[in-house]
Design a protein with these regions (language model features):
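Glycine-rich phosphate/diphosphate-binding loops that line cofactor/substrate pockets in enzymes
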Residues: 37-45, 251-256
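Internal helix-turn-beta structural module
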Residues: 304-342
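Conserved phosphate/anionic-ligand binding catalytic regions in large, soluble enzymes, centered on
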Residues: 48-61, 323
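Redox- and metal-dependent alpha/beta enzyme cores, enriched for Fe-S-associated oxidoreductases
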Residues: 245-250
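N- or domain-start disorder-to-order transition segments that initiate the globular core
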Residues: 1-41
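Active-site-facing alpha/beta catalytic cores
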Residues: 7, 66, 79-244, 265-281, ...
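Conserved, mostly hydrophobic/aromatic
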Residues: 52, 261, 327
């Protein structure tokens, strides 16, 4: 067997007991949950922005970024609901490269999953303590969600995981919104089937238990573009793409038809500077068609303190070490413009 069992890690409950959430923070998290759920169900008409760095590489820069988001949130609170995107694990196309703070709490150090679990919990907790935001993170490893389940308000399932049965089943047992990205192939039926699976109850094996999920009516779509057989990026944020998704929802029996548009990845062709243009085009589509306007609940934007990216050992504070992001000045300008368009 080509597998070495290095050490047994503490259970999610043990880590939660080591780093507990106070009653005040628990109440704040529940209020954040309520607002985010209200956007997904349509009770709250604000536009949700899932916004933050491609990967949360260092706690200090993430905390500064989140603090700036809090100040910005107060300026746009009537039309925009901000949810920090704080991704602590990073899927890799080939399996190589920096895999996120969970794997490497020090980007230049060796993998250490125990230190990583503690580091990501402490980081998410500090964001909640210092800014009042409970964050979004990617559900890359389904079993790891429960280390953070009391401090996250949104989970995303990525393009490479959306066909996986365990991801779908775990999503059906979460009590927060879960966004299902379309697969890299662009096949929307795969995404819609994932949403259907997540919205239904299931009995399955998890962490040495037979468990039963109740179904998650807040599971919804994320459009992130696709890649064709020649490796070319194909966007799916245009008006006709949104119309097609609306028709798929209309033919389904899914609860809470909703979509978040990812403005980067294959939608931008990895041209990160195009995110502002894409975001504004999506909002124009929502204004021209009421059905699309009701379906589009928000945008996912990759943003950090500085424009662009660097290698993992670059050492520049607030500059992404994975995919390039728009910097703070562009971020602030974009959010204010979106608030004006939304108003």
């Amino acid at each position: 067997m080509n597998l070495e069992f290095k050490r047994k890690l503490p259970t999610p409950q043990t880590v939660k007991d080591m780093y507990p959430v106070t009653e005040e923070l628990a109440r704040q998290k529940l209020e954040n949950d309520r607002q985010i759920k209200a956007v997904i169900t349509g009770e709250d008409q604000r536009l949700m922005l899932l916004i933050g760095p491609c990967s949360a590489d260092r706690e200090d820069a993430v905390l500064e970024y989140a603090a700036r988001l809090r100040t910005l949130q107060e300026r746009v609170k009537d039309t925009i609901l901000i949810v920090p995107r704080i991704y602590s694990n990073k899927p890799r196309t080939t399996g190589d490269g920096y895999k996120g703070m969970l794997h490497q709490p020090d980007p230049n150090g060796q993998p250490d999953m125990l230190k990583g679990l503690i580091a990501i919990r402490k980081m998410h907790m500090k964001v909640l303590e210092q800014t009042g935001f409970s964050s979004a993170d990617e559900l890359l490893y389904p079993e790891n969600y429960y280390y953070l389940s009391d401090i996250l308000s949104y989970a995303a399932i990525g393009a490479r995981s959306v066909e996986d049965q365990q991801h779908r089943l775990i999503a059906s047992g979460l009590d927060v919104p879960v966004g299902m990205k379309n697969p890299t192939s662009g096949d929307l039926s795969v995404m819609m089937n994932s949403i259907l699976a997540a919205q239904h109850p299931h009995t399955f094996l998890f962490s040495q238990w037979e468990v039963h999920s109740k179904g998650n009516p807040l599971a919804h779509a994320i459009l992130r573009g696709s890649v064709n057989k020649y490796g070319r990026s194909l966007p799916n944020y245009h008006y006709e793409d949104l119309s097609q998704l609306y028709e798929l929802y209309a033919k389904s029996a899914l609860a809470n038809p909703a979509v978040i548009i990812d403005t980067n990845h294959s939608n931008s062709g990895k041209r990160w500077e195009q995110q502002a243009r894409i975001a504004k085009e999506v909002l124009h589509s929502t204004r021209h068609n009421g059905d699309i306007g009701r379906m589009v609940k928000g945008l996912m934007i990759e943003s950090y303190l500085l424009d662009g990216c660097q290698k993992p050992d670059g050492g520049v504070y607030g500059l992404s070490i994975t995919d390039p992001c728009i910097g703070w000045e562009k971020t602030e300008q974009l959010v204010l413009e979106l608030a004006e368009l939304r108003g």
